[in-house]
Design a protein with these regions (language model features):
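Conserved phosphate- and dinucleotide-binding cores of soluble alpha/beta proteins
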Residues: 1-107
């Protein structure tokens, strides 16, 4: 996704009709308190799409851990699983387990 893309905000009849069985989401960063985005329009668009998905998967590489940004888009319990490229620090392992979020990474 182009990080400079502009997404509609507000009552959009087209996006309101979307429903997803499974949706994958990216983010700009995560920390112990949640998931973040840098753009107001992207943050609101992702929040709206999250409400329309039955299952939500967060895709986050190791460079995004311990990185906060302007707009919080959710909490870990909002997602069914987190997919990353390597095993995160133990404090995140404990957090995902506590929040009942499946963690997937290559061994």
């Amino acid at each position: 996704m182009n990080s400079n893309a502009i997404f509609p905000y507000g009552q959009d009849p087209v996006s309101e009709s979307f429903r997803f069985d499974l949706a994958f989401f990216s983010c700009r960063g995560i920390d112990q308190d949640g998931i973040y985005e840098t753009s107001f329009s992207q943050a609101n668009f992702k929040k709206e799409m999250m409400q329309r998905a039955k299952q939500k998967i967060l895709l986050v590489d190791d460079s995004k851990f311990d990185s906060t940004h302007f707009f919080k888009i959710g909490n870990f319990e909002d997602y069914d699983a987190v997919v990353t490229n390597q095993m995160p620090h133990s404090n995140y392992l404990n957090l995902f387990e506590t929040k009942d979020v499946e963690l997937l990474y290559p061994e």
